Amino acid sequence: MKIDAVITWVDGDDPKHKLKRQAYGSHRILHTDDVAGSTRFRSVGEIFYCVASLNRFAPWINKIYIVTDEQNPQLDSFLSENFPEGHIPVETIDHKVIFRGYEQYLPTFNSISIESMTWRIPGLSEHFIEFNDDLILAAPVTPEDFFTENGVVCYAGKRNSYLVALTRMLKYHRNGTKRITYKHTMLNAAKLLKNHPYILKMHHTPKALLRSFYENYFAENPETLHKNIEHRFRNVHQFNPQELQYLKLYQEGRCELRSVEDNLLYLYAKDSDTYITKKLEHFSSLEGCKFGCFNSIDQASENGCRMIIDWIKERIGLKE
């Protein structure tokens, strides 16, 4: 079984990208954190650690595709220095490639839109694993951690979709609109399947996916694809394409649910240095934990950011 990795990445500090974002986004959109706040685009080198972790802990990956917008992470010298005996091939894929035939929706600054199109990468294997650039592998993994004989592994738990929707209704609105949360996009996916009675509450882990699912589903439902990618910034009406695949495959008995407990190191870096120190000390005791998500490292203090990056480098075994 050939398995590829797909990483969606943007260097939001690139002046050209900043100008492009400002040209298409209103002041309200650009200052709404869950839609287009600056931390959604800012980079502190996460892509290097994500790619390095794949080489260290999943050398069986066939190829790494980095999906981006007219940018290049410049990984060659970093990989040559840290993996002198060879590394997994890396190819950068521009948004124009996966949006071919849908150019009217570019440029896009919307991770949901982009993730709805990654299956269109030319040459992508049937089995692929999707990463955000704030994810790393934190221990050795095998293909069986992601795929079964006839389907996929999903690190999630079932939640009653009606209760989740009710909870959302009781929460505050912000900036005159409903806040767009991870759960909200999952609920929208469930609605596509005739108001599915539950969602699979995914965690911040890599997502194992089948290319043919999207190819077939969107061939049968082309308008659904158009509606999900037409928004340049995140929109309350969008659905999570990964959740859609998992719900449908689960109905068919082709999606195996596994607990994320003891398998995920999650750190929300906005918190204090004391919190970060305690979290990293705890993480160090979990040697077999497979996945790491370091959310919004750019929001940590300078010292907190350094602690996180030093810990990641040590975990992966990188040179200074």
Protein language model features and the residues they cover:
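Short loop/turn segments at strand-loop or loop-helix junctions that form parts
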Residues: 4-13, 18-19, 95
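A solvent-exposed, charged loop/short amphipathic helix patch at secondary-structure junctions
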Residues: 12-40, 155
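Short catalytic/ligand-binding loop motif for oxyanion handling, primarily in non-cytosolic enzymes
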Residues: 13-17, 63, 72-77, 100-101, ...
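Active-site-proximal specificity loops/subdomain of glycosyltransferases
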Residues: 33-38, 42, 74-124
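Short, acidic, metal-binding catalytic loop of nucleotide-sugar glycosyltransferases
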Residues: 53-61
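GT-A fold catalytic core of metal-dependent nucleotide-sugar glycosyltransferases
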Residues: 72-73, 117-158
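Long, charge-rich alpha-helical interaction segments
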Residues: 153-236
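A glycosyltransferase accessory/donor-loop signature
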Residues: 200-320
